[in-house]
């Protein structure tokens, strides 16, 4: 099944994105890596991520396609290929825009469009989406893209653009952390309430 194959390949690509991790797998897990139909060299994780992208395109899932682009971007960043990473991560962000336009906007409405860098933007379009009940988006989807974009821009010496993406990444992390804390508190209160009901009954 393309979906599960793609997820497996993408997971491996992420694990081996950095040269040191790849060397570890190459040294300790050669027998497993030899099962694939391409050379086990430094491009191996990139080929896996590209193959995952093909699988997800076949499955036609925007979320997974964006994730595969992020995996490719992560590999390119780890190998100092920052401009290529930036180009790839732009495609990931376009997947988010495409999803948003499909479900929430007229195609010509660009007010909520996400950009890799928008000079002067202090509201960080994309972050407010998370707090809107009517807008369904996955915070981790955007945060992973922003994290890698920050690395790409830093590698290219573009500090403002790097900081912009890093700030969005941190804002999303903070928002999801608070959200999880609230959910945890709610579950705890619910459990306490059930316990109190049992005691009183």
Features from the language model and the residues they span:
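Extended alpha-helical scaffold regions
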Residues: 4-27, 67
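Hydrophobic positions within repeat-based interaction scaffolds
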Residues: 5, 21-28, 40-46, 59, ...
């Amino acid at each position: 099944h393309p979906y599960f194959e793609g997820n497996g390949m993408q997971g491996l690509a992420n694990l081996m994105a950095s040269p040191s991790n790849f060397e570890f797998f190459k040294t300790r897990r050669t027998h497993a890596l030899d099962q694939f139909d391409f050379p086990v060299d430094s491009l191996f994780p990139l080929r896996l991520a590209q193959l995952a992208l093909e699988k997800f395109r076949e499955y036609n899932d925007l979320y997974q396609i964006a994730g595969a682009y992020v995996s490719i971007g992560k590999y390119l960043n780890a190998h100092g290929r920052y401009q290529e990473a930036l180009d790839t991560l732009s495609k990931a962000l376009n997947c988010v825009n495409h999803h948003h336009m499909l479900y929430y906007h007229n195609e010509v409405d660009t007010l909520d469009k996400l950009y890799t860098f928008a000079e002067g933007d202090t509201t960080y379009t994309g972050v407010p989406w998370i707090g809107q009940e009517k807008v369904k988006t996955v915070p981790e989807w955007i945060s992973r893209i922003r994290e890698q974009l920050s690395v790409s821009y830093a590698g290219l010496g573009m500090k403002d653009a790097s900081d912009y993406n890093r700030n969005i990444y941190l804002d999303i992390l903070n928002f999801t952390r608070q959200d999880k804390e609230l959910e945890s508190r709610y579950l705890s209160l619910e459990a306490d309430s059930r316990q109190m009901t049992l005691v009183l009954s």
